[in-house]
Amino acid sequence: MANLDMEQHSSENEEIKKKKHKKRARDEAKKLKQPAMEEEPDHEDGDAKENNALIDEEPKKKKKKKNKKRGDTDDGEDEAVAEEEPKKKKKKNKKLQQRGDTNDEEDEVIAEEEEPKKKKKKQRKDTEAKSEEEEVEDKEEEKKLEETSIMTNKTFESLSLSDNTYKSIKEMGFARMTQIQAKAIPPLMMGEDVLGAARTGSGKTLAFLIPAVELLYRVKFTPRNGTGVLVICPTRELAIQSYGVAKELLKYHSQTVGKVIGGEKRKTEAEILAKGVNLLVATPGRLLDHLENTNGFIFKNLKFLVMDEADRILEQNFEEDLKKILNLLPKTRQTSLFSATQSAKVEDLARVSLTSPVYIDVDEGRKEVTNEGLEQGYCVVPSAMRLLFLLTFLKRFQGKKKIMVFFSTCKSTKFHAELFRYIKFDCLEIRGGIDQNKRTPTFLQFIKAETGILLCTNVAARGLDFPHVDWIVQYDPPDNPTDYIHRVGRTARGEGAKGKALLVLTPQELKFIQYLKAAKIPVEEHEFEEKKLLDVKPFVENLISENYALKESAKEAYKTYISGYDSHSMKDVFNVHQLNLTEVATSFGFSDPPKVALKIDRGGYRSKREPVNKFKRGRGGGRPGGKSKFERY
């Protein structure tokens, strides 16, 4: 009982002590509060809060100290006090900093508090600087992209075109100009001569036809004035294509348009010329014929001459014709030369036919000379397996893809087309030696086709625009990298277009890849797997041996293949004396080489070839000792 009374008395004493402590604390608070208000009225709120915080904590500290002595402190209370400490310390340090009486320890605390703010501010500045840098980089990237892309942001509407021309362009589906169009059309419309170079599929045709149509419109050309614009193309198909574009552009104009090309009826063409053709598209040979022999052909008023694919026009069999044509045409005229590549011979022609020309090369400085969307590869196939390789490849994609296959000679193209038809491979062919009334429908048919196989020679390698071609297969390699570029240019045409190209080489021809890479043409090797080839060799050999017409066709193809091989200008790559004739014969369906008269150069390997003299016809391309029809690359 005594103990209980003592404990009760002790607890009462504790309560009394607590009350005394609280009262003392309140009195001290009043004393501290009053002078602060008098001396520093500007900091009234801050000091009051700070002092109140300190006062409120004082009894807790004393209570905590007392409880600690008794050994019954509350852990939760300790945690609460510990959490409140930094907050109060922050407020105190901020206040002391304002008064300027912080000590070193407090300075460190303030520095620690200010550090995150400084970091945030720095991060914000860095972000702003980065944004500006990114914006500059984006603009540079856009400029770079525009320089390397086919398209520009310039519209046809920005040109000072007649309403009728602009209406036609709009109906054709064009809004923005390509690089060559944006750079060539303005000087041409101002009457300047232009030497233009742009990759295939870049819109060269519109680049010269739009100024041509505008010229005829401005000078009010009529049929009785004759021909005011003349466009010369190297091939019939390219002439037909250019004629089609010109016809669309002149749809709402009163001026007339026509074409004269080899293979058509000359008499019919002469009658049309006599009626007056204001814009004439022509191939060199037939044009020269009409210039010299058609009396009703009026060309004395010619204002504008265009030579499209000028480097091809200058090849053998065209040089002399072109020289005569230029001598017959009026000297006072505007002239332009356009091509996918600029050779020394084109520059020579420009010097004698152009006056102070504007030189435009939209591909200058590009890392690659072929189209961006083009995937290019090559496959090394032994000569004896070439035919089986081609059959296997075409069988895989027949009816699924649109494919062009290039051969070195007309006879080789003809034989393969006949063979494929015998074995139920549907295919078309474009080459020399086919009547124009058959060749033109074939050309138009392949344009409209979604899938199909076209076998062709280099006659289809320049300027022709076949939509959506998936594969270019160069079964026979080209003469040089320039021809390679033109061939693969039949696919991946236009902005964003995709396509694939495959070059078939024998092991002896592998050095050609070095020349391609030196010409900035990226090619990847594809693995040749013999086990995947169709096992049809006995069938093909039996078919050819039993079919007289097919056998004769194969003989001619074999013969011209070897003659064509001998005419290659790059003798260090394509040396006819390194051919294994037994393997070559196998690739044409023979078990043994056929007996044919081969006229090839017996002089052996020659590492160098002299270039063809400008404006002089060289000796026959495939004849013994004759120079190549192509200038050495």
From Swiss-Prot:
A motif (DEAD box) lies at residues 308-311. Residues 386-534 form the Helicase C-terminal domain. One of its GO terms (biological process) is stem cell fate specification. InterPro entries: DDX18/Has1_DEADc, DEAD/DEAH_box_helicase_dom, Helicase_ATP-bd, Helicase_C-like, P-loop_NTPase, RNA-helicase_DEAD-box_CS, RNA_helicase_DEAD_Q_motif, SPB4-like_CTE. It holds the Pfam family DEAD. Gene3D superfamilies: P-loop containing nucleotide triphosphate hydrolases. Keywords: ATP-binding, Coiled coil, Helicase, Hydrolase, Nucleotide-binding, RNA-binding. A motif (Q motif) lies at residues 154-182. Its EC number is 3.6.4.13. One of its GO terms (cellular component) is nucleus. Belongs to the DEAD box helicase family. DDX18/HAS1 subfamily. This is DEAD-box ATP-dependent RNA helicase 27.
